[in-house]
């Protein structure tokens, strides 16, 4: 059992790049994963679960790149109990300053019967072999019994004890289907600490199917867990995971109830990290999202406004500045030069050089001609868009035109460079965005269907940048795209073409893998 009294530091295990990326429609490129990982390091997370290396060559390459280039956090890879998977996972994380192998297997009766078709004894033996092999490769091994909250406790204790005996130093209790209730989940954590002997850290991994992921995570910490697994913005499969920003601020604000605990998170980076993940994944942050939502510190009721104007603590338990939610500072205008632009990015923790810097600066100058002042949020949107178009794009938008009116179909025409050759196309659709999607699909010769569309204002004002996020189904594979502009129609065209370029890269990678 871990000695809670000597481990008051709560480890924050971020799984945005693994469990978070499993959300439908999210498909991150290696450079986007690296950018998120670098921001997570600036945020101060303890462990980054960078991916599932055996899932694909692309996932393996992304994990290995993060292991080699991101410094500070432990870089972790997920693995099944198969020895070959564990060895593949090790190859992906081995170059990290600090690395971990995270081994999992299902343990609930439902999963054993319908998924694994294994007996309890067979699962125990698989865990024994897997942890022993992982421990031969690395010093830091984590074990997760998937669907733990629906696993009979005697069998759960048995599996966890075997994992500890073979060398696992972290035992994770996953509420895989969001079944847990805070007080019941806390009792489970307490019982594991009591019944499983040895030296280890207890971790929790809570899903949000009942809207209780954050509450369950905080209850687990109060019961003795010293690691929390979570995702930025709470993204993930189905209803998502525990939101990192909520867990961290819950621990900070209610230490009087939870216990005298701390994390290594620089909370001033929370809002920026949230915006970055939102833009790169194409998943918007709901306006009323706790901590990082647009309305998290907004007040409309007259009584509330009066109280906040007198003393913000009357209706706010979090200082907006402490989580990076203060008003974005105006930093640049159309007369700003390349050096000032690069310095502004550096102050934001963004380092660009070479072609990436040139492309981003050129896009900045284009938008600065239309917008009087650009804020940090504007710059973040520009960088996010341009970094998504630097990976050898096949398609480049030259020009487009859309005509629409009441009672008739929208008609669009466009010129697109396809591998450097101009291609002209025209199409009609049910509205301007649908027509744009159809004409760009025709120009690129991809069978594409728009499945999701959202638009948000990056900043306020009549000249505000609009950020458009789309999801597009291309041959049964869903990809996301984004675009920014002061013109929403142009932002939509950029987002659609960004998605089509991603789809083309996915096809090219698949073709290369099939070639001997």
UniProtKB/Swiss-Prot annotation:
Transferase in keyword set: yes
UniProt xrefs under InterPro entries: 2-IPM_HCS-like (IPR050073), 2-isopropylmalate_synth_dimer (IPR013709), AIPM/Hcit_synth_CS (IPR002034), Aldolase_TIM (IPR013785), LeuA/HCS_post-cat (IPR054691), LeuA_allosteric_dom_sf (IPR036230), LeuA_bact_synth (IPR005671), PYR_CT (IPR000891)
Obligatory cofactor(s): Mn(2+)
PROSITE patterns with a match to the protein in the record: AIPM_HOMOCIT_SYNTH_1 (PS00815), AIPM_HOMOCIT_SYNTH_2 (PS00816), PYR_CT (PS50991)
Known role: Catalyzes the condensation of the acetyl group of acetyl-CoA with 3-methyl-2-oxobutanoate (2-ketoisovalerate) to form 3-carboxy-3-hydroxy-4-methylpentanoate (2-isopropylmalate).
Subunit structure: Homodimer.
Protein name, per record: 2-isopropylmalate synthase
